[in-house]
Amino acid sequence: MLFRSRALSGGVTTDKVFDIVRRVRQKVTLPMVFMTYANVVFSYGTARFLDKAAEVGIDGLILPDVPYEEKEEFAPLCEAAGLDLISMIAPTSHDRIKMIAAEAKGFVYCVSSLGVTGVRSEITTDIGAMVRLVKEANPDIPCAVGFGISTPAQAEKMAAVSDGAIVGSAIVRLCEKYGREAAGPIGEHVRSMKVAVLQKD
């Protein structure tokens, strides 16, 4: 929430984010996904937001505050726009993990621990067991692990038992620390993460 407040106070708007994505998409061919809150989508107009996201080159949408039971409010519109509504799976019962995984699109975001996003010194959840349950229900769906991954060692550990590691808050903190000069430190950090993740091979 702190990062969101700073973005808003800095003049960031949804349309400005769309413009940034449009420019990035001109040089980047990798899939790109928005992670935002449902109220951002609602306030822009759900269908309008999703159509615009697809237009500028977004491939999927993660709404961490929308539980599985409420996803049908967004899923048909995402499908119509050509976007994957990405499922998040937290440490929970085996039956629930399999239920969510069975209908997952794009990839599954495996939440490493309960709580809010951010940097953690240690991740204790048995991610390997979660991933195995997901694959039992949906063998072809990729699983990426997020929440609390901030170091190359953590990324390597998570990638060893899943298909990838998601890093967010650590990069935002580099933006906060270096401001307009953040591109270099971010690039260095991402490269170190990439090297660590590839160690699993």
Show where each model-derived region lies.
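Catalytic cores of alpha/beta
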Residues: 92-102, 137-138, 149-165
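Conserved, mostly hydrophobic/aromatic
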Residues: 53, 100, 158, 168, ...
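Hydrophobic faces of well-ordered beta-strands that scaffold small-molecule active sites
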Residues: 32-36, 61-63, 85-88, 108-110, ...
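Active-site-adjacent beta->alpha loops and helix N-cap segments on the catalytic face
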Residues: 9-22, 42-47, 63-80, 93-99, ...
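Glycine-rich phosphate-binding active-site loops on the catalytic face of alpha/beta enzymes
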Residues: 56-62, 67-70, 112-119, 147, ...
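Short, small-residue-biased leader/transition segments that mark boundaries at the very start
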Residues: 1-2
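Active-site mouth loops of central-metabolism enzymes
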Residues: 31-45, 86-92, 120
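C-terminal helical cap(s) of enzyme catalytic domains, especially alpha/beta-barrels
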Residues: 173-201
